[in-house]
Amino acid sequence: MKRIGVLTSGGDSPGMNAAIRAVVRKAIFHGLEVYGISYGYQGLINGDIKKMELGSVGDIIHRGGTMLYTARCEEFKTLEGQQKGIEQLKKFGIEGLVVIGGDGSYRGAQQLTKHGFPTIGVPGTIDNDIPGTDFTIGFDTALNTVIDAIDKIRDTATSHDRTYVIEVMGRHAGDLALWAGLADGAETIVIPEAEHNMEQILATIKRGQERGKKHSIIVVAEGVGSGIEFGDRISKEMNMETRVTVLGHIQRGGSPTGADRVLASRLGAKAVDLLLEGKAGMTVGIQKNELVYHPIDEILDRPHTIDQEMYKLSQELSI
């Protein structure tokens, strides 16, 4: 293998630039040429591909977002779109591809592998919802962003004796809500992986009031439902002032934490190693601080699960 490509796809996450940097530098270290594909699979179809040098990835390790840009591409879900992408890869002489993104990005990588093109997936998503790895690139940064926001909201909640509902990202996974809620001592954490009982939530708030508690913090993953609806119901049922904050896309931005920079560097470099070893259709990850890899097919067939021990702890501490 003499020439590889790298792209980012789907939602951006802090640390993607560090992963791109690692792929480019590791490949050049081993004498390979590297081509960056802009705007994900859409850019691949369109031939938006340029050669990258060491200087191409200078001064990016600390930057959020992705220097290669990203996009969602419905066309690549079709056989025709996939064939167009493969034609572009062949046109540029690219023999292997590193795809950085979430499960949708992995599905594109899976199709390329089925067509006989060596592809390695690197988990980049703030949702932390990719099986086969303890952490995904961007999760730690997003977690710290959410914690910082809740810390500030708690100050004003206490000052005004209010209950706050904070909606965080996580359409199908509650990791961000669970970890942030536990770190911030939320009274209630509502996630897609666990059933929630509104009566129990109201009872928890009421017990706090009876103890003289000046505020309540409720963290809701967006996949469960609207934070605004939660807030409205609490206001009506408890006859109390409730405020709702939807954190939104602020969770995706910002300079990546040290943990995300190191994780991204390790995973990006490992992806290049796997291509050099002749592996294809694999995803890289980290488990118990050890780098691992798994078949993409296996990862996509495996459901995301929450850390039950952490969820149990959050329930025990929010009495």
UniProtKB/Swiss-Prot annotation:
Molecular function (GO) terms for this protein are: 6-phosphofructokinase activity; AMP binding; ATP binding; fructose-6-phosphate binding; identical protein binding; metal ion binding; monosaccharide binding
Question: What Pfam families does the database record attribute to this sequence?
Answer: PFK
Q: Which enzyme class? A: transferase
According to the UniProt entry, how is activity regulated? Allosterically activated by ADP and other diphosphonucleosides, and allosterically inhibited by phosphoenolpyruvate.
**Could you tell me the EC number(s) of this protein?**
2.7.1.11
Q: What are the binding positions for ATP in this chain?
A: 11, 72-73, 102-105
Q: Which UniProt keywords apply?
A: Allosteric enzyme, ATP-binding, Cytoplasm, Glycolysis, Kinase, Magnesium, Metal-binding, Nucleotide-binding, Transferase
- The UniProt entry annotates the active site at 127
User: Which GO biological-process labels does this protein carry?
Assistant: canonical glycolysis; fructose 1,6-bisphosphate metabolic process; fructose 6-phosphate metabolic process
Q: Which reaction does it catalyse?
A: beta-D-fructose 6-phosphate + ATP = beta-D-fructose 1,6-bisphosphate + ADP + H(+)
| Amino-acid positions noted as binding Mg(2+) in the UniProt annotation, renumbered to this chain | 103
Which of this chain's residues are annotated to bind substrate?
Answer: 125-127, 162, 169-171, 222, 243, 249-252
Q: Which domain of life is it from?
A: Bacteria
* Coiled-coil parts of chain: none
Q: Which GO terms describe its cellular component?
A: 6-phosphofructokinase complex
Q: Which InterPro entries match?
A: ATP_PFK, ATP_PFK_prok-type, PFKA_ATP_prok, Phosphofructokinase_CS, Phosphofructokinase_dom, PKF_sf
Q: Where in the cell is it found?
A: Cytoplasm
What cofactor does its activity depend on?
Mg(2+)
Annotated residues that bind ADP are located at: 21-25, 154, 185-187, 211, 213-215
Which pathway? Carbohydrate degradation; glycolysis; D-glyceraldehyde 3-phosphate and glycerone phosphate from D-glucose: step 3/4
Family stated for the protein in its record: Belongs to the phosphofructokinase type A (PFKA) family. ATP-dependent PFK group I subfamily. Prokaryotic clade 'B1' sub-subfamily.
Subunit structure comment from the entry: Homotetramer.
Task: Outline what the protein does.
Answer: Catalyzes the phosphorylation of D-fructose 6-phosphate to fructose 1,6-bisphosphate by ATP, the first committing step of glycolysis.
Protein name as it appears in the record:
ATP-dependent 6-phosphofructokinase
Can you name the source organism?
A: Shouchella clausii (strain KSM-K16)
